[in-house]
Amino acid sequence: LSSVNAQVKINEYSASNSGGAILDNTGDNSDWVELYNTTATAVNLGGWSLSDNPANLNKYTIPSGITISPNGFLRIWCSGKGNPADAVGHTHANFKLTQCNGDWIILSNGGALKDSIQMRRTQATHSMGRKPDGSATWNVLTAPTPNATNSGTGYTSYAPRPVMNLPAGFYSGTKLVALSVTPSN
């Protein structure tokens, strides 16, 4: 999927929200998507759609009355609850995010693709976010920032998993153990 130069962008997501650090309005550790308005004008998102399925761009329709402030942020909980927005704007999509490489988050309006991201796996409590906000550069954020500027240190990827030269087990005598990693591209 390719994106057009959108006013509103998918700016951050967490598909591994756990541990109680960021709870939704029902007290659950729901995953979430943050949208960012790159303009100096409020944007009415009522009728826009969010999806995790390229074959169904209209999987979740954002309720009428939901706007995103100029240069502002909007978090949509991906809880699977599909609840309409409450009085303070907590919005729950009717699907959940998964921790599978290759899954998508897609933002569209009237069937026209506005933005999309092919998700990457993250560790528990981490998120992926654009840094700086709205840019083309995605980073691992070890301190997620829903509804706020993506601040703090961002990492392009996780360190590769080390490999030992000997399999696990019990050995007699002295053994020389070496660790190695394959650098990521």
Task: Locate each region found by the language model.
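Intrinsically disordered, low-complexity linkers and terminal tails enriched in Ser/Thr/Pro/Gly
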Residues: 4-184
